[in-house]
């Protein structure tokens, strides 16, 4: 998944100081906050983007990793996006909980449990034939899955978590600094609002463990290079009962030996004899589905000419229709080493006739030039 540059999102240079980054974020966060743009999905998405950028660039370690390795370095080596994160947590560090309705939950007991898992990306390479017919692709990857001992709760046995005394179950801590009220995530319960007294020995209280996942993903026919197939709930498991993220399978199509692709159309180059190009005829070629088709070559076909075979290309996504196949003919020059004596004599005779014809045309042409 393509990600925007964090410095560009915050409209700062790569040498910007921490204070400059904070000021830039504050300005943009106020501009795009959902409470100031009700119903504006574009503004909401922009708010999430600048908040994600600030979360990385305001942290010296994450910023160093991002500067060196890009988005992978900022996320600890994994290529995922934390789509389920609560961006208002970071926003509240600047403005407290009184900006608007979307941050009011920080003043009351948390109604949600756990932390949502991250979305994951998996690059899958398939053949053009696979993309033509569609396949069930077996894939495997390693991620955090739900702990089967505690069933994702993080607690050992039937003992339930208790309310955090530090934040009184809100998951947030407020501190007064002059005229400003600063609100931050509770460092005792890490924003959960509750404490696990008897942690699961298998997962250490996180509710998840590291393991390999094996699944089969349906790749539809007609899929194009770079397309993403979303597998709901197959991303990283949420912590302590949180919602699992999604898996995005990014399709890469291997280069084909014969065909090139442009959307649903296919293109190929086919060499033909000089005599066939002159006299016309038919050639047999094999289409992407393995079937043989006859392609008519008109008389006098020149090298580079494209012959169209309707509905012999790739299928359109979610449709029974197909694109076209374009056959570009390449007229081969005869090699005298591969010709018989009779063939050479016939070519010489043809050349003599052609030479006389060309001379007559040349004389007529230059005669017109002289008259002018």
UniProtKB/Swiss-Prot annotation:
Its principal location?
cytoplasm
Where is Zn(2+) 2 bound in this sequence? 164, 167, 186, 189
Which stretches make up the J domain?
5-70
A GO cellular-component term linked to this record: cytoplasm
Q: Which Gene3D superfamilies match?
A: DnaJ domain, Heat shock protein DnaJ, cysteine-rich domain, Urease metallochaperone UreE, N-terminal domain
Domain characteristics, as noted in the entry:
The J domain is necessary and sufficient to stimulate DnaK ATPase activity. Zinc center 1 plays an important role in the autonomous, DnaK-independent chaperone activity of DnaJ. Zinc center 2 is essential for interaction with DnaK and for DnaJ activity.
Family affiliation: Belongs to the DnaJ family.
* This protein's name: Chaperone protein DnaJ
């Amino acid at each position: 998944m393509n990600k925007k540059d964090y410095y560009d999102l915050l409209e700062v240079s790569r040498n910007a100081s921490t204070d400059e980054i904070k000021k830039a974020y504050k300005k943009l966060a106020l501009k795009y906050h959902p409470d100031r743009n009700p119903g504006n999905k574009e503004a909401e998405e922009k708010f999430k983007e600048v908040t994600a950028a600030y979360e990385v660039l305001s942290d010296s370690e994450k910023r160093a990793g991002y500067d060196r390795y890009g988005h992978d370095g900022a996320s600890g080596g994994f290529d995922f996006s934390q789509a389920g994160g609560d961006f208002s947590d970071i926003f509240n560090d600047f403005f407290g909980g009184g900006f608007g309705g979307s941050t009011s939950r920080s003043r009351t007991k948390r109604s949600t449990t756990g932390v949502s898992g991250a979305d994951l990306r998996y690059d899958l390479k398939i053949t053009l034939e696979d993309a033509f017919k569609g396949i069930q692709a077996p894939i495997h990857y390693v991620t955090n899955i739900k702990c089967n001992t505690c069933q994702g709760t993080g607690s050992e046995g039937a003992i339930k978590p208790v309310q955090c005394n530090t934040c009184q179950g809100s998951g947030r801590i407020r501190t007064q600094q002059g005229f400003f009220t600063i609100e931050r995530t509770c460092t005792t319960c890490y924003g959960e609002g509750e404490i696990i007294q008897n942690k699961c020995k298998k997962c250490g209280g996180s509710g998840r463990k590291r393991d390999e996942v094996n699944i089969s993903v349906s790749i539809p026919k007609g899929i194009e290079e770079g397309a993403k197939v979303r597998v709901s709930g197959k991303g990283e498991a949420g912590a302590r009962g949180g919602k699992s993220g999604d898996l995005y399978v990014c399709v890469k199509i291997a280069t084909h030996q014969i065909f090139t692709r442009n959307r649903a159309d296919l293109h190929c180059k086919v060499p033909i004899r000089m005599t066939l190009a002159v006299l016309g005829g038919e050639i047999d070629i094999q289409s992407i589905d393995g079937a043989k088709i006859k392609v008519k070559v008109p008389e006098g076909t020149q090298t580079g000419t494209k012959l169209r075979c309707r509905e012999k290309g790739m299928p359109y996504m979610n449709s029974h229709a197909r694109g076209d196949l374009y056959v570009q003919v390449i007229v081969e020059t005869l090699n005298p080493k591969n010709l018989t004596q009779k063939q050479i004599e016939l070519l010489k005779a043809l050349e003599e006739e052609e030479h006389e014809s060309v001379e007559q045309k040349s004389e007529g042409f230059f005669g017109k030039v002289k008259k002018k």
